[in-house]
């Protein structure tokens, strides 16, 4: 148990080391291009079931963290996220693509005019926001057959304020914490499994 505790401490230090490297990259924002973001949605069953699609691509990057959120008149809700990273963020950069999908259900028209924001971060970040429009007239008998609507450039609206600041460090900390957390959990799970097997012998 003592060894496991020491190893966990080492893992935490290593994770914090990775945090410093990536946070520095976020602060200077150089070395790779911001992720590309594309979005689409379907509003089915008389505008009761809203399905949102968010594709994020980052090239030649140490990692990609992406997510989506929706802002209705009364509240903002974080929907989903995904993280992929290189084991050697300093030297090994890859091409990443995330395809996020999330479905929301509510009374007819609940999410009409709500704003949806999709983003991706690889040390710098890209984000896009659109307003949900009714699809009642785009369905077959207004029941269940809807056409996926791909969001066009002229449909985009301003991103929320924290995406527009010249200094995004506070927001970047939230996203990059996901990367460190995933690394820590994977390593901690491995240590626990190794310790358990050793004591079984």
Swiss-Prot record:
Instruction: Indicate the secretion signal residues.
Output: 1-25
Extracellular side, ranges: 26-170
Taxonomically, which superkingdom? Viruses
Spans traversing the lipid bilayer: 171-191
Q: Does the keyword Nucleotide-binding apply?
A: no
Where does the UniProt entry place glycosylation sites?
46, 49, 55, 84, 95, 113, 122, 137, 144
Query: How does this chain sit within the bilayer?
Result: Single-pass membrane protein
Query: Carries keyword Signal?
Result: yes
Cystine pairs = none
Q: Which residues lie on this side of the membrane: Cytoplasmic?
A: 192-201
* Keywords annotated in UniProt: Glycoprotein, Host membrane, Membrane, Signal, Transmembrane, Transmembrane helix
**Lineage of the source organism?**
Viruses, Duplodnaviria, Heunggongvirae, Peploviricota, Herviviricetes
One GO cellular component from the entry? membrane
Q: Which organism is it from?
A: Human cytomegalovirus (strain AD169) (HHV-5)
What family classification does the UniProt entry report for this protein? Answer: Belongs to the HHV-5 UL120 protein family.
Protein name in UniProt? Uncharacterized protein UL120
Q: Main localization of the protein?
A: host cell
The record's subcellular locations are: Host membrane
């Amino acid at each position: 148990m003592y060894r496991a505790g020491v190893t966990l401490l080492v893992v935490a230090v290593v994770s914090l080391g990775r945090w410093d490297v990536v946070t520095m990259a976020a602060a200077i924002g150089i070395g790779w291009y911001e992720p590309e973001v594309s979005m689409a949605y379907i509003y089915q069953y008389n505008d009761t079931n809203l399905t949102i699609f968010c594709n994020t691509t980052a090239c030649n990057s140490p990692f990609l963290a992406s997510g989506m959120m929706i802002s209705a008149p009364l509240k903002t809700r974080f929907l989903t996220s995904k993280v992929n990273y290189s084991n050697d963020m300093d030297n090994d950069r890859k091409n990443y693509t995330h395809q996020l999908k999330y479905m929301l259900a509510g009374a007819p028209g609940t999410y009409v005019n709500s704003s949806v924001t999709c983003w991706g971060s690889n040390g710098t970040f890209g984000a896009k926001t659109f307003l949900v429009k009714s699809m009642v007239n785009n369905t077959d008998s207004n029941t269940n057959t809807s056409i996926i609507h791909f969001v066009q450039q002229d449909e985009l609206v301003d991103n929320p304020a924290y995406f527009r600041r010249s200094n995004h460090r506070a927001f970047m900390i939230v996203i990059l914490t996901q990367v460190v957390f995933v690394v820590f959990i994977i390593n901690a799970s491995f240590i626990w499994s190794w310790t358990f097997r050793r004591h079984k012998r």
